[in-house]
């Protein structure tokens, strides 16, 4: 951020205190151009019924980044109807461990509700089946989100993994290999359940290690929570498998 000449604004505290639209107050007061929030935050303020476009200026705001969990189609709708019509909503997916995103926003391409726009620069991102075959020509068929090639911020390894001290990239430790390369040999597997769309966008269905598999049909937990949380009596939900 600083290398590009931008100024980072960090907020410490509850984003809904003392009022639900607190972050939009900060957007106006600090002239924020890019606002990074969680998908859960967008869903929470959507359910609270706030309308920032009616109560705030938001002239400086041109990008909203959403992360942490899949952003629902209803979340996309709320941003464009209740926040700002000409904002770039960038739903992103990556990891703290790699300090990067595998898939995310592209300001040169159209945005479709419920979809991440595509792979990020420098990332050979793909969704593959159990045999490592790409699913890009099978829109809607879900598989493992992977990166087929090394990327600039690939972690070198884990501390004290197989040897004392710093990791040796020439001799990766067993925990490191198990965490990222065991599921799909030769590819970095991030642990997300994803599918391509007909627009060559990506839909994240949830964590692949929490994917339910009744009768051989794989179902992402996010698909269930989205339906459950549409009920007015449900504020939040958690889905897990039970044998």
Where are these regions (language model features)?
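Conserved AMP-binding/adenylation subdomain of ANL enzymes
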Residues: 1-34, 48
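Gly/Ser/Thr-rich phosphate-binding loop
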Residues: 3-6, 32-37, 46-113, 124
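AMP-binding/adenylate-forming catalytic core of the ANL superfamily
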Residues: 28, 35, 151, 156, ...
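Alpha-helix/helix-capping structural signal
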Residues: 40-43, 153
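Conserved ATP/PPi-binding loop(s) of AMP-dependent carboxylate-activating enzymes
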Residues: 120, 133-181, 219
């Amino acid at each position: 951020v600083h290398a590009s000449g931008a100024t980072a604004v960090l907020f410490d505290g509850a984003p809904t205190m003392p009022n639900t639209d607190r972050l939009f107050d900060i957007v106006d007061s600090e002239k924020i151009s890019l606002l990074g929030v969680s998908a859960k935050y967008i869903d929470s303020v959507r359910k609270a019924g706030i309308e920032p476009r009616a109560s705030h200026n938001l002239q400086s705001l041109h990008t909203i980044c959403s992360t942490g969990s899949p952003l629902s189609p209803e979340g996309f709708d709320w941003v464009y109807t209740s926040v700002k019509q000409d904002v770039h909503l960038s739903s992103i997916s990556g990891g703290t461990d790699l300090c990067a995103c595998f898939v995310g926003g592209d300001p040169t391409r159209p945005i479709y509700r419920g979809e991440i726009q595509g792979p990020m620069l420098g990332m050979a991102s793909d969704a593959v089946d159990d045999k490592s075959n790409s699913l890009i020509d099978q829109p809607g068929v879900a598989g493992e989100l992977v990166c087929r090639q090394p990327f600039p911020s690939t972690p070198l390894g884990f501390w004290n993994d197989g040897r004392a001290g710093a990791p040796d990239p020439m001799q990766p430790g067993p925990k490191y290999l198990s965490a990222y390369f065991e599921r799909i040999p030769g590819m970095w597997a991030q642990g997300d359940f994803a599918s391509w769309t007909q627009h060559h966008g990506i839909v994240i269905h949830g964590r692949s290690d929490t994917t339910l598999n009744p009768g051989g049909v794989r179902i992402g937990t996010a698909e269930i929570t989205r339906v459950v949380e549409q009920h007015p009596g449900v504020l939040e939900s958690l889905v897990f498998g039970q044998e």
